């Protein structure tokens, strides 16, 4: 058996001949007689049988393997996809797998092998029911007595053997800095501070006042002590608040204790803020006199979680911007008084130009390639400004005044070729570095752009005042953070 020679009279090279099958077979030693019949190889045990029949036969899925490789393991010998093996899976098939520790946000839980599919877990551990389990099999603070079984019993293999289950579960890690969640009625522990913790994260809302107000709630957030009464003295109101009805020491149960959150605003929403900022002064007559007396105090109490949304900076009156002067009489910025401006309100360090875009293809191409075409009307001003200061372009949609982002100019004019969407009205291209990209509407951005040119609408490519440009960049940042929910 030799290879066919395809060489013609015009080709000087020919394909070398390959050795025949008999020569290849002689290079490999024949199988020994005591070798098991399960061994599959390219070289068949019967010499008269051609090799192609064993190679091309599709009777079994594991029928062919190279002589240089070990055959693939069978599924019953080594289960594929399970790196973590236990002694005998039959011993733990009745144990419930703790899915509350399986799918929680540990630092490592989203990496293999701790985040496996629920279907594979249910097939392996023979669990039934809903996922995750309604109650974990072992609570963190279990007070049940351990079970003891005699040596011949098989119950210990799947009832309360924690050491056997430790091999197949992620390690029990603390997920937060807050204390662990407690049950509804805490067990009474006399002479121990296990269930009573000092509140180190906050102070009571009346620490700055001279005395505790009479309207302060009896159930403040945390574990405030109260006089112990005997069980016949406990009223129905106390039982409704969750006070344990047995034992000498009792602790009030309030909703803040359920998940150990240190947020008093869940109980007293207006305890740390003046009612004038939330509601009219007369809305809370019993609290308004006390809370308004704190407004004269210089040191306000520490702001508590949950945080309110970050408020937008107060609007600026750009029509009176020229009135802001320093001691020398120089014009200064309304936003940053240390920035000295010229009489046109322009800084010599940072200069801002507005780009009104009416072409969606142009802005999409600019966001991908970071190349922008400058029109002939403003090309000289932008080129001169780039040589002296940092130049920023603020992109705004011409029709809707949506903010499209802002970028810094990082090259001079004509340093790059014009993009494909430019026309004869463009002088050249500049390379830009995007700082923020978005497509958001803000009423204040629209207001500034519509009154930028001395009370009239802005023109494409015009230079704006330092305060206007800095303010627009800040508003774009606020709009983006509010859109993605990061403004808290």
UniProtKB/Swiss-Prot annotation:
The keyword RNA-binding applies. Disruption phenotype: Read-through transcription of regulatory lncRNAs (long non-coding RNAs). Decreases premature pre-mRNA 3'-end formation of ssm4. Increases levels and cytoplasmic localization of mating and meiosis specific transcripts during vegetative growth. Decreases heterochromatin formation at meiotic heterochromatin islands. Pfam families: YTH (PF04146). It is found in: Nucleus. Residues 350-476 form the YTH domain. It comes from the Eukaryota. InterPro entries: YTH_domain (IPR007275), YTH_prot (IPR045168). GO terms for cellular component: chromatin; cytoplasm; heterochromatin island; Mei2 nuclear dot complex; nuclear exosome focus; nucleus. GO terms for biological process: lncRNA catabolic process; mRNA destabilization; nuclear lncRNA surveillance; nuclear mRNA surveillance of meiosis-specific transcripts; nuclear mRNA surveillance of mRNA 3'-end processing; nuclear mRNA surveillance of spliceosomal pre-mRNA splicing; nuclear polyadenylation-dependent CUT catabolic process; nuclear RNA surveillance. Transmembrane segments: none annotated. RNA-binding protein that recognizes and binds N6-methyladenosine (m6A)-containing RNAs, a modification present at internal sites of mRNAs and some non-coding RNAs. Functions alone and as part of the erh1-mmi1 complex, to recruit the CCR4-NOT complex and the NURS complex to target RNAs. Suppresses the meiotic program during vegetative growth and promotes the meiotic program during mating. Binds to DSR (determinant of selective removal) regions in meiotic mRNA, and recruits the NURS complex to targets. Component of the erh1-mmi1 complex composed of mmi1 and erh1. Interacts (via N-terminus) with erh1 in a 2:2 stoichiometry. Interacts with rrp6. This is RNA binding exosome specificity factor Mmi1. It comes from Schizosaccharomyces pombe (strain 972 / ATCC 24843).
